[in-house]
A protein has these predicted regions:
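Catalytic and substrate-binding clefts that recognize carbohydrates or anionic sugar/phosphate headgroups
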Residues: 1-124
Length: 124
């Protein structure tokens, strides 16, 4: 099932080509906040793996690292980089629960996937 949640007053980015009506209330998974800008936070179980973010550095499981989605044109793609050119703001959490999130946001997003706190993922 696909649900769409809208926060603030977004403009059309054409990243999603199918019309999906906005859902009311809060998602069933994680917590969204707009108090100090946008943020999404969820707990991660010990065996949860996190996949996605397109061509981001590191291995296929993105857990345990910090990623910045900022579309920076930097040719030196090494393990210590937190941001590459393309922004693929889609993640899948696989483990006790299987759920995916797409963040249609044209600005900078920070994906802290168990980096600051090993059992917490925060997107802000």
């Amino acid at each position: 099932m696909v649900k769409k949640f809208v926060y603030g007053t977004p403009f059309e980015t054409e990243a999603v080509v199918k019309e999906i009506p906005s859902s009311e209330g809060n998602p069933d998974y994680g917590t969204f906040s707009t108090e100090n800008g946008f943020s999404f936070t969820t707990k991660l179980a010990d065996d949860d793996m996190v996949f996605g973010l397109g061509e981001a550095n590191r291995g296929i499981n993105k857990r345990g690292f910090l990623y910045i989605s900022d579309c920076a044109d930097d040719p030196n793609h090494v393990e210590s980089k937190t941001s590459l050119y393309a922004a693929h703001n889609f993640i899948i959490i696989s483990g006790e629960t299987h759920v995916g999130f797409f963040f249609d946001y044209p600005g900078t997003l920070r994906f802290d996937i168990g980096y600051t706190t090993s059992d917490t993922m925060t997107v802000s």
